[in-house]
Swiss-Prot record:
This is E2F transcription factor-like E2FF. One of its GO terms (biological process) is regulation of transcription by RNA polymerase II. Residues 21-86, 145-225 bind DNA. The gene is E2FF. The lineage of its organism: Eukaryota, Viridiplantae, Streptophyta, Embryophyta, Tracheophyta. It comes from Arabidopsis thaliana. Keywords: Cell cycle, Cytoplasm, DNA-binding, Nucleus, Repressor, Transcription, Transcription regulation. The keyword Repressor applies.
Amino acid sequence: MSSAIVVSQDAESLGLQIYSRKEKSLGVLVSNFLRLYNRDDVDLIGLDDAAGQLGVERRRIYDVVNILESIGIVARRGKNQYSWKGFGEIPRSLDELKEEGMRERLGYSSSNNSDKVSNGCEREEPLTLTPDDQENSSSSKMDQKKEKSLWLLAQNFVKMFLCSDDDLITLDSAAKALLSDSPDSVHMRTKVRRLYDIANVFASMNLIEKTHIPVTRKPAYRWLGSKSIAERGLSLFNSGEPKRVFGTEITNLRAKRNKTYCSSIRKQIGYKKHDEENTEQESKPAASKYVFGPFSPIGASKTNNDKVGKGRLLEIEALASTYQPQYCNQEITGLLGHFTEAWKKWYAEVDRNK
DNA sequence: CCCTCCCGCCAATGC
DNA sequence: GCATTGGCGGGAGGG
């Protein structure tokens, strides 16, 4: 009778709604999004559908897909429509980004171009490209808008990790580096605001991890393509846990932020802060349960037809083996291995539980 | 108090 | 014209 869950349920049954900022975070949204669409039978993603399924405003879906697209997990297919590419695309994307980033860093071979931070178009140009010869690449001002897009910002953010030699990056430093213009003032703040969103998303996928700079306690992020630490994830399946399981409610129909109401109410009700939360260093010494994000492959949730899940797994494994030899890229292969490992472990666990 | 960042207004852009 | 996209920053939540 003291668990946060119980309390919140009571509150709900009383007709009261609880607002929790955390449950509304982009990170959680993305987790749900991925859990929802990481299936074998998923190909197209409708924006309206997504918004409905996840119980959020349309606007938020744009944030999600824009960021995910920067890593190649989804791709724009058309109006109101994205297609699911899957985690298998990540290595490729990262590889490209790295190469691109390196080139920009010390590649003065080509003629053109300011030293603005990239703009190397990646995004599928609308098929109606002008019969413009030359490898070229734009130039005009048309893409000054694009320069501020979340999509590009996200790409440049990961480029920083992939190319830079220091593995701890502060949002401020990132913002500064990715600003290229107007060194100070409001632009910084805005940029940082955006970076918070991006960082949260990547963090929720365990692509990066939030830490602190050694001596200064300034928060910073570290890239962990592969060596992601084990923790949680399987907890999704351990039934009857007092823990607040991570996305038990795909449909996020929680109260709105509503000015001035809820916070006080919540306190009166006796809302206790989530116990659990950061299981940071759960003492799980040797148990190397790799987890890619707080979500798990859905195909297997209804085990018995391991066709579904296996298909995905094999697909990844195949990719891993074909991909490894050609590119000797630590980051990438590590990442893939990590994925494969995660899936294997997960399926094993499910089978046992069954 | 400062840091984090959700929310949704409304401007571009597309059709 | 309306519909889609998505910058942008006010100001609420959380430490």
